[in-house]
Amino acid sequence: MLNSVPEDDAPAPARSRMPPEERRRQLVGIGLGLLRERPLDAITVDEVARRAGISRGLLFHYFASKQAFHREVAAAGLRRLHRAMWPADERPADERLRGAIDGYLAFVERRPGRVMEMAGGSWSADPELAAILRDARATIADGLLAAADAGRDAPADGPLALLRTQSARAWLAFAEQLALDWVAEPSVEREALVDHLEASFRAATG
């Protein structure tokens, strides 16, 4: 669960000792909370430290730089997207692809600004951050393929397998933009959009 985020004029919480990993999780959680309000590159370490009730210098004890902190926040946000698509409860094989697409769309509905930034914002300006995003997209595309292939034979390697992987990654860029456009201007009912995305993924990947 995200940490509660106080108002800007609220006093900083009293400083308390925490184990290092717990403190890191707290700081990343505050960053995720701020990411609901503003772009990643507009999140300052001073504000994060103030909301955590620690000094700016102590924050840098846990993260080597502001960029390193931003990367941790971005990676945590992408893990949340992954959990939204593939929750812990295992779905029946024939429902996995649709369930993952539905979870993706729900994530976009809740956080359109974050997804828009992932699609073409400051995340692509930092090479290391861009690599984190690229790896996350590849993992999502592979997961969608596995969901589509559940219960049926599919090529595991060779040119056709590579083409299907490339198609899944290209489809993800298409779905990203379509979902953002739909959130901004709903053109069809939500279920119809999920139907369309599922059908287009199966058509693209064979």
Where are these regions (language model features)?
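Hydrophobic alpha-helical connector segments
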Residues: 72, 86-113, 154-161, 167-171, ...
